[in-house]
Amino acid sequence: EIELGNQVQKMMILTEDGQINEKNKEFTTQQKRTIKIGRRSKERMMKANLRLVVSVAKKYQGKGLELLDLVQEGSLGLERAVEKFDPTRGYKFSTYAFWWIRQSMTRAIACQSRTIRLPVHLSERLASIRKVSRDLAHKLGAMPSRIEIAEAMEIDVEELDSVLRQALSTSSLDAPVNGDDGRSFLGD
């Protein structure tokens, strides 16, 4: 793991973000060898940690994206982790990679799971509201009020209402509504 990480880092230094710099194709034989070894090391680290991606993806299943889409996004996060991993810091790679994988998946869910995309900061704020609400419900034994949630988050009730309003789901104008003739639509 450490050796593979060092080889990837050497490749990243020689190349520009893992890609051979088109302007400077004149590498020495040793540099070409280092790049080749670095690419193989990157590939080995990616393959060795795909099970981690799948296990993280299963935790986010049912939150707006299919499992395969989550695995794909997690693989992009894993690739970023492989490229940025610094083995000299003493952390295990899987611990480091977990953060990048999870970050990639949560961003994808925030950006792709809704008809109208919410900004990431709003999605994160909404997630923290849900977490505080769950924690308070567990602590109080009942669903907390908006005032209790706002106090726990140290924000105004108006700000809480604003975030919750922006996060409401959308409805299609072609959705049928209960009408006398059975042919009424929301857009009518």
What does each of the following model-derived ranges do?
Residues 1-117, 121-135, 139:
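Alpha-helical promoter-recognition and RNA polymerase-docking modules of transcription initiation factors
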